[in-house]
């Protein structure tokens, strides 16, 4: 796609989703305009096996725009990244058509595993500011991820996801494996401990009742 064809498409995308734009020419002032344009060039090189050239383009673009899109990611038409600073899209991420991302969004992996390790977003998904979607699973079409949410598992189509899974955890966990997902959950651990104690108490009560009956 030539520059002017891209420009016309991007103007339409921005006008559809950002009321702040007043004139078409403003599109070139959006960081996402250049981030996505350069991603398309880098992705083509990446597919041709010219990995170093592709990575060089993506890293230079990340420094200039604050948006890091790995050239290996697969992205459909109509991606809109509003504001954009701090957005990260990983190597094996797959994005459908008409995706909207806000600043601070991470579409990341869960550690050092190989193969598909980043999320798949189907058509018309919106991911709010600061949301983190980590792992190899699918966010169903027409779903919305609320700002600040942390998503670690599959989301069905036409869903709304709200909330942060992060809780304070006092258990020591090794950080050298780069695993962001398989971390002991303090609330779940506490519930299990209480359940185990409850089971023991019931057993003690049953023993006492049996002795009384004797």
Feature locations, PLM:
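Terminal amphipathic alpha-helical/low-complexity segments used for targeting or macromolecular assembly
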Residues: 1-65, 175-214
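Structural signal for interior beta-strand "rungs" in well-ordered beta-sheet cores
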Residues: 62-169
């Amino acid at each position: 796609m030539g520059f002017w064809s891209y420009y016309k498409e991007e103007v339409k995308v921005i006008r559809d989703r950002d009321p702040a734009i007043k004139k078409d020419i403003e599109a070139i002032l959006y960081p996402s305009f250049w981030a996505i344009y350069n991603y398309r060039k880098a992705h083509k090189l990446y597919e041709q096996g010219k990995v170093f050239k592709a990575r060089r383009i993506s890293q230079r673009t990340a420094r200039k725009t604050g948006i890091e899109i790995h050239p290996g990611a697969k992205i459909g038409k109509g991606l809109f990244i509003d504001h954009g600073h701090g957005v990260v899209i990983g190597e094996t991420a797959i994005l459908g058509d008409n995706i909207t991302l806000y600043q601070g969004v991470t579409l990341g992996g869960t550690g050092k595993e190989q193969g598909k390790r980043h999320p798949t977003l189907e058509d018309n998904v919106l991911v709010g500011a600061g949301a983190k979607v980590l792992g190899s699973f699918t966010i169903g079409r027409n779903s919305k991820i609320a700002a600040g949410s942390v998503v670690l598992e599959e989301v069905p189509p036409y869903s709304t996801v709200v909330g942060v899974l992060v809780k304070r955890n006092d258990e020591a966990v090794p950080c050298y494996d780069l695993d962001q997902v398989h971390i002991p959950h303090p609330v779940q651990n506490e519930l299990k401990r209480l359940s185990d104690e409850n089971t023991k108490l019931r057993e003690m009560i049953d023993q006492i009742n049996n002795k009384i009956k004797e």
